[in-house]
Regions:
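Pentatricopeptide repeat
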Residues: 9-14, 18, 29, 44-49, ...
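Leucine-rich repeat
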Residues: 1, 5-6, 10, 16, ...
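Methionine-biased hydrophobic packing positions in alpha-helices, especially
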Residues: 1, 36, 71-72, 106, ...
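A broad helix-preferring feature
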Residues: 20-23, 163, 168, 198, ...
């Protein structure tokens, strides 16, 4: 491009940088960023956010944090997108303490967390088996006026099922419905799987009928889980009947 007498501008370089990150060429994107800095381009927050997110996806969270500090030293302040990428990156390494620190930091900066911010933290706590902490973050989200979505509820339901806290999982489903969030096939599949693992196949079937009555279409995961559940309790005839209904 430059050989033909055309000098790339910030928009051109930003587009290329975004493309590089999307194909996993983060190191090349950083080299382009350095060239942009050398060329005295006016760098916007969006450029840094693209690379921070890409570094986090590459599990290079330390490098992402360093870029955040570098960006801030240049007077460019992070936004919700910046923090969500970093919180996700930290949580991928189960660094939930550091993630909570960032949550507190963004609050101090008057940056309002969104449902994704809280859902990331709920998911991390659930995977760590820290259900009390997961519920606290979930409740904090509601207290701050942020309505959980189906992903948030499914994450909490899954956390309870993983720890065999099926009563709590049902309560989470009921709260979901009460607050006007419609359960989806994942919500029911998670509960059905939890009950099948505990050999409570009749209760699992109750959820199967409930989802059908509410217009939620069972998928192959639903049927496979229930068929496996019937086989686990040696009700092979029922398993075969369900197989023929697929």
């Amino acid at each position: 491009m430059e050989k033909n007498g055309y000098k790339p501008n910030a928009i051109t370089c930003g587009t290329i940088l975004n493309a590089l990150c999307k194909i996993g060429q983060t190191s090349m994107a950083i080299r382009l960023l350095r060239k942009m800095e050398e060329g005295n381009f006016e760098l916007h927050l969006s450029v840094y956010n693209i690379i921070i997110d890409s570094l986090c996806k590459d599990r290079l969270v330390t490098e992402a944090l360093n870029l955040l500090f570098e960006m801030m030293s240049k007077g460019i302040q992070p936004d919700l997108v910046s923090y969500n990428s970093l919180i996700q990156g930290l949580c991928n390494f189960s660094l939930w303490r550091e993630a909570i620190t960032l949550l507190n930091e963004m609050t101090q900066r008057k940056i309002v967390p969104c449902v994704r911010t809280f859902s990331i933290l709920v998911d991390t706590y659930c995977k760590e088996g820290m259900l009390i902490e997961a519920k606290k973050v979930f409740d904090m989200m509601i207290q701050r006026g942020i309505e959980p979505n189906v992903v948030s509820y499914n994450t909490l339901i899954d956390g309870y099922c993983l720890q065999n806290k099926l009563k709590d999982a049902i309560e989470a489903l009921n709260m979901m419905v009460e607050r006007g969030c419609s359960p989806d096939v994942v919500s029911y599949n998670t509960l059905i799987n939890g009950f099948c693992k505990k050999k409570r196949i009749d209760e699992a079937m109750n959820f199967f009928h409930e989802m059908s009555n509410k217009g939620v279409t069972p998928d192959v995961v639903t049927y496979n889980t229930l068929i496996g559940g019937f086989c686990r309790v040696e009700r092979h005839k029922a398993a075969l009947e369900l197989f023929h209904k697929m």
